[in-house]
Design a protein with these regions (language model features):
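A short helix->beta-strand "capping" segment at the edge of beta-propeller domains
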Residues: 2-28, 56
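A short beta-strand motif characteristic of beta-propeller blades
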Residues: 18-24, 58-63, 98-103, 138-144, ...
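Beta-strand-rich domains and repeat architectures in extracellular enzymes and scaffolds
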Residues: 21-48
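Residue-level detector of Asp-centered blade-edge/turn motifs that repeat once per structural unit
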Residues: 36-38, 76-77, 116-117, 156-158, ...
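Loop/turn residues immediately N-terminal
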Residues: 47-50, 87-90, 127-130, 159, ...
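Blade-level signature of beta-propeller repeat domains, shared across WD40, Kelch, NHL, RCC1
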Residues: 266-300
Length: 300
């Protein structure tokens, strides 16, 4: 990123971050993940390329040719990830970006997630069913919800997953599909993020702000920000939250929702991933640029 391209960072309010690194994919962004344990950033673009970047934004592994790539999820350990190819195929990749297996689920896939260790994979389907597969491609759990799910995350330390529909439902299920709770959620939802233990849940609630829930689905209030939040990500332990808005706002908050820094971005944000310690975050723009911003050194 050139000095002129970094200039937008200086237009913010509050304590500005340091630009740590930037990377530009070959095509518009499809997905972005931060492996919280390994520190790798995984990027997928519309040309079918998948990149693994190290902690300094350098390419470690690159794979091309996954045509019709539409979504990406990755384990915290960095060992395995999953992509959606076409509408209905779930494909699992290893750290070398070699294909491990594929499964045609015969329904459009709305959302995917990988557990922190790369052992289990969740796929939320168009018809309202969610399937959980293990690393040998066996379906070990499934459940159906009244509204089709659009965002899903595995909980670290518990064999559970938390998910939400675009509107109307926030829920938690065990790995075998057993429902633990489900709560109505009447705002439109742009994104879902959870702390590592699932004790804090945040929804980018668009016109209703950033909504916070506890691990049992009880409302803990709303973080009010300027604009319409559509992307959100939290640190592993709850100390920082980053959000973006439809109006191209980018906002860095503390655990109580106090705004520490805010800026207008030069283009639309597709994905945000907060550093597990809350030192900073990775921001993926729709056009293909990925930027790492930090307050203090994120690594030695």
């Amino acid at each position: 990123m050139t000095e002129s391209e970094q200039r937008w960072l200086d237009q913010g309010r509050g304590l500005s971050p340091e630009w740590t690194w930037s990377f530009t994919a070959d095509a518009p962004l499809v997905g972005l993940e931060l492996a919280r344990e390994s520190g790798d950033t995984i990027v997928a673009d519309a040309s079918g390329s998948v990149y693994i970047l190290d902690r300094r934004g350098r390419i470690v592994t690159l794979s091309r040719g996954l045509h019709e790539l539409v979504d990406l999820a990755w384990s915290d350990s960095g060992t395995h990830g999953a992509v959606v190819v076409g509408e209905t195929t779930l494909a699992v990749l290893n750290r070398q970006l070699r294909l491990v297996w594929t499964s045609d689920l015969r329904e459009p896939i709305r959302a995917i997630a990988v557990d922190p260790y790369g052992h289990h994979f969740a796929a939320c389907l168009e018809g309202g069913e969610t399937r959980i597969l293990n690393n040998t491609r066996k379906t070990i759990g499934r459940f159906k919800t009244t509204r089709r799910l659009s965002h899903v995350r595995f909980v670290t330390g518990h064999a559970d997953l938390i998910a939400t529909a675009d509107n109307g439902l926030l829920c938690r299920h065990h790995l075998d599909g057993t429902p633990l709770w489900g709560e109505p959620c009447w705002s439109n939802i742009g994104d879902l993020t959870i702390t590592g233990d699932g004790g804090a849940i945040f929804l980018a609630g668009l016109n209703l702000g950033i909504q916070r829930f506890d691990g049992n689905g009880n409302s803990q209030g709303t973080y009010v920000v300027e604009g319409t939040p559509n992307r959100v990500s939290t640190s592993y332990a709850l100390n920082r939250v980053v959000a973006s808005t439809v109006e191209r706002g980018l906002i860095w908050l503390d655990s109580d929702g106090e705004i520490l820094w805010a800026v207008e971005t030069p283009e639309e944000v597709l994905t945000l991933r907060c550093d597990p310690l809350g030192a900073g975050f990775v921001c993926g723009f729709e056009g293909g640029r990925v930027v790492r911003l930090d307050w203090g050194a994120p690594f030695p």
